Regions:
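Cytosolic juxtamembrane amphipathic/interface segments immediately preceding
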Residues: 2-8, 67-81
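Hydrophobic alpha-helical membrane-embedded segments
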Residues: 14-47, 196-198
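Hydrophobic alpha-helical transmembrane segments of multi-pass integral membrane proteins
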Residues: 18-25, 79-102, 122-132, 153-166, ...
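Membrane-interface amphipathic/juxtamembrane segments adjacent to transmembrane helices
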Residues: 30-72
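Transmembrane alpha-helix entry/boundary detector in multi-pass membrane proteins
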Residues: 78-85, 104-122, 146
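Membrane-helix boundary/juxtamembrane motif in polytopic membrane proteins
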Residues: 138-160
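Terminal transmembrane helical module of multi-pass membrane proteins
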Residues: 156-230
C-alpha cells in the first residue's frame, strides 16, 4: 500500500466504486445480448473450400488488427487514418492503466521505461483527438452525421488525455508538475467516464465482438468471407 492524503483516498474509493457500477451495467447488458438466440442461416454452404462459419467469424473478429485486409487502408491516406485509430485507442488503454495503477502501485509509473511509454501513448492520443475535433467540426459531412454525444465524448476525452499527461508528469516529477490535485482530478474525471461510457456511444466496443462474429459467420457460411483477391 502507499500513503495517500484524505483527498486522494476519497478519489480512489470513488474511482473503484465507479468501476463496480460499470461492471454491473456491462454484465447486465451482455446477459441481455446473450439472451437472443443466434439465427441459423438456412442457405446451403456457399464454398466450404474457401471459407466456413468458424473461419469467417474468426477473421471478422480479428480484422481490426489486420489492416492489410481492409479496403480502407489500401491508400496512403487510409492507412494514415488507421494509424491514428491505433494511436488513439492505445492512448485510451494507457490512460485507463494510469488511473488504476496509480491507485495500486504508483511507483510502477515512475519507472522511466513505463512512465515514458505511458506518457508517449497518452500525448499521441491527445494529438489525434485534436485532429478528430478539427475533422468533425470542419468537414460538412462529419457535422451532418454527428450527435451531441459525439461532440461531448470527443471533447471530454481530449481533456482527459491532457489531464492524464499532466498526471503522468506529476508522478514522474517532470515539467514542474508538483500538485497532487492533478491525480485527484484525473481519478474523478476517469470515474465520471466509467459511469458515463455504458450509456453513451463510446460503449460500441461492447457490441464489437457480437456484431463481428455474427457477420463473419453469415458471410463465411456463404463462402464470401474472408475474400480472396484475384
Amino acid at each position: 500500500m502507499h500513503d495517500v492524503s484524505p483527498a486522494l483516498y476519497t478519489a480512489e474509493i470513488v474511482h473503484w466504486i465507479a468501476l463496480v457500477v460499470m461492471a454491473v451495467v456491462y454484465t447486465l447488458r451482455i446477459r441481455w445480448l446473450l439472451s437472443f438466440k443466434l439465427a441459423a442461416d438456412k442457405s446451403a454452404p456457399g464454398n466450404p473450400a474457401q471459407s466456413d462459419k468458424k473461419r469467417g467469424a474468426r477473421h471478422s473478429l480479428f480484422n481490426v488488427a489486420m489492416p492489410w485486409s481492409m479496403e480502407s487502408t489500401r491508400s496512403r491516406k487510409g492507412f494514415g487514418f488507421y494509424l491514428s485509430f491505433v494511436i488513439f485507442h492505445l492512448g485510451v488503454v494507457a490512460g485507463i492503466a494510469l488511473a488504476f495503477v496509480s491507485t495500486i502501485a504508483p511507483d510502477v509509473l515512475r519507472v522511466p521505461a513505463v512512465g515514458w511509454t505511458t506518457m508517449t501513448l497518452i500525448v499521441g492520443a491527445f494529438l489525434v483527438s485534436l485532429y478528430r475535433i478539427a475533422r468533425r467540426t470542419l468537414r460538412p459531412l462529419m457535422r451532418l452525421i454527428s450527435t451531441p454525444d459525439d461532440y461531448f465524448s470527443l471533447f471530454m476525452l481530449t481533456g482527459w488525455f491532457a489531464l492524464g499527461a499532466a498526471t503522468q508528469a506529476y508522478l514522474m516529477g517532470i515539467w514542474g508538475m508538483t500538485s497532487e490535485t492533478l491525480l485527484v482530478a484525473y481519478l474523478y474525471l476517469t470515474s465520471f467516464f466509467l459511469l458515463y461510457v455504458p450509456f453513451s456511444k463510446i460503449s460500441h466496443y461492447l457490441y464489437y465482438p457480437f456484431t463481428r462474429i455474427y457477420i463473419g459467420r453469415a458471410l463465411g457460411h456463404r463462402g464470401s468471407y474472408p475474400f480472396s483477391r484475384a
